Swiss-Prot record:
This is Ribosome biogenesis protein ALB1. Involved in proper assembly of pre-ribosomal particles during the biogenesis of the 60S ribosomal subunit. Accompanies the pre-60S particles to the cytoplasm. It comes from Kluyveromyces lactis (strain ATCC 8585 / CBS 2359 / DSM 70799 / NBRC 1267 / NRRL Y-1140 / WM37) (Yeast). The lineage of its organism: Eukaryota, Fungi, Dikarya, Ascomycota, Saccharomycotina. The gene is ALB1. Residues 10-24 have a biased composition (Basic residues). Component of the nucleoplasmic and cytoplasmic pre-60S ribosomal particles.
Amino acid sequence: MPSKNSINRPKQKVNLNRKVHQRAAKRDAMEKKGLLAPARSSGTSKSGQLKSIPLDLYKGEHSTSGALTTKTLSKKRAKKIERNLKYVEQRKLLVDLQSQSEENGGMQIDAPVVKKEKETKKGQLEKMREAISTVLEDIQSQGLSLQTGSGTTLGGQYFL
């Protein structure tokens, strides 16, 4: 069969029939999976939510239509889901604390946070760098001193 853009291309009806057939097959597959069972407008619909079979298995919400299933949950995946759920709870607590602090009128800190700095022994090179930088800062802070003498820059005095 020639391609869609060739000179002796097939009629438009052939292409449209193929697309309609593909969409119908896709729709039937979604109905078999149970994705179209509750309408999108109903409250029990999961439309727009994430679909995760391992998470459903972890929560016990995944229902099997038959007695035999290939959907299992490994220990590694179960631990990962537990860890992620713990992180979700921590984020919720953090958001709640931030909203409470905004309601109370700004930032209120319960305990002051003190950052500990490690005392490091300074080597000879670091001591020299600090000394040079302090000397340069002192020179820059003094400003530029100009000698105010009488005369021009080229030589003797200039009278009007």
